[in-house]
């Protein structure tokens, strides 16, 4: 019976789900907006909301809980230093999910999950390969 089963399995093992959501949390905090499938976005939302609440509470113990959940110290720093002060007057509802059509290939429902009042410049920052200036000048 499926009584009391509130979370989706997403066709993954428990370890894979935990790692995937840790990576997605770090990506969302870094870029403040990510595109994913709708079921993943719906499962990610409460995890991120709880992380922002941890950031708002502050303290070393909450920081360690966030590191254990996300496994990315740089993004935990951003969570506590940038996002927590931004949402200090907001009681929940830090993220929104916007439906984004269907993916070509498998027709999966896609969605954009983003922070409310997000920083527009954070999208795509520090993503992908970078070219070193010294190599570009030598060529």
Swiss-Prot record:
This is Large ribosomal subunit protein bL17. May be methylated thrice, on undetermined residues. Residues 120-139 are annotated as: Disordered. Keywords: Ribonucleoprotein, Ribosomal protein. GO terms for cellular component: cytosolic large ribosomal subunit. Part of the 50S ribosomal subunit. Contacts protein L32. Belongs to the bacterial ribosomal protein bL17 family. PROSITE patterns: RIBOSOMAL_L17. Gene3D superfamilies: Ribosomal protein L17. One of its GO terms (biological process) is translation. It comes from Rhodopseudomonas palustris (strain ATCC BAA-98 / CGA009).
